[in-house]
Amino acid sequence: MPKAVSLFSGCGGSDAGLVKAGFDVVMANDILPYAREVYLANQPETDYLIQDIRKVDKFPSAELLVGCYPCQGFSQGGARLADRSINFLYKEFARALTSIQPKAFIVENVSGMRNSTFKHLLEDQIKRFSNAGSIGYK
């Protein structure tokens, strides 16, 4: 069974799809205790770490890394402030990508990132993900 690591996992909606597709989610992460409760009610075998991603120092090996870092800074429904610290959590996803070196990764966010205010952040994400480790993701 292929392994997956999930970051910014929330209540596990996306991870439920991974499990249904045959993945073993070996680690999930978020900072919200209630999200962990819901997640583990549905996927009790997953190691769910409640911790700020910036403080996670080790990631398990996996064939797939998935994540949906917060979008409030980019979303039409949010404050849309380019300098909010949550707008830079993609760097933590890139750090995990470099550490794990999975065969593939999936990352999702809102279309507001293409807005001219945030375009430089989207371009930085693409650059960081493409250069993560020795694999050369495209």
Language model: regions and residue ranges:
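Extreme N-terminal starter segment of soluble prokaryotic enzymes
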Residues: 1-4
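Class I SAM-dependent methyltransferase "Motif I" SAM/SAH-binding loop
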Residues: 7-11
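A short, Lys/Arg-enriched amphipathic alpha-helix followed by its capping loop at the start of a domain
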Residues: 17-24, 42
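Conserved SAM/SAH-binding beta-strand->alpha-helix loop
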Residues: 32-33
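Conserved SAM-binding loop
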Residues: 39
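Conserved SAM-binding strand-loop segment of SAM-dependent methyltransferases
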Residues: 44-52
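Class I S-adenosyl-L-methionine
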Residues: 55-64, 74-138
